[in-house]
Amino acid sequence: MNAPAPILIGHDGSKFSRAAARRGLSLARALGLPVRILRSWSISTAPRPATWSPGFVPPREDFAAAVAEALRQDVAPLLAEYPDVQVTFETPHGAAGRELIRASEQAEVLVVGTRGLGGFAGLLLGSVSDQCVEHAACDVLVVRTPGIDQAPGRTLPLDATLEG
């Protein structure tokens, strides 16, 4: 029998990805599924490795190790709340949307936040969550962050929407 596909969580260190991780871990606990937390990176987004010094650019492996350590530290407090959930980590070098879509091929569901650390480039290229909804190989859950992603006054009573 094959192992169940994991819940894949995209995590970039933002408060939005923390909300997504919490929801993904809760869902994993309820469904009895494992979790894989993915953080993609580039040299410009990676934390500075311990081997960095002025005038010396460390090898890519050192950046990869720094990203993996930062991810583990970022999610450690949350994982302590879900000790019964099996969690693995993946830190590929590449664009977030592309890497999450690739990883979604072996996932039950992909969980992402509404926004991340993308900044202005994300506005120009489209958000990672939009890319995932459009192209992921599995279902995608986009998690709203309480108090931030709320849009008061935008809902209409059902009967108002049915009027001619």
Specify the residue positions occupied by each region the protein language model found.
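Small/aliphatic-rich secondary-structure junction motif
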Residues: 2-55, 135, 145, 160-164
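Structural beta-alpha unit
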Residues: 1-3, 16, 30, 76-112, ...
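General small-molecule cofactor/ligand-binding pocket signal
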Residues: 36-38, 88-92, 141
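Short, structured coil segments at secondary-structure junctions
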Residues: 128, 136-137
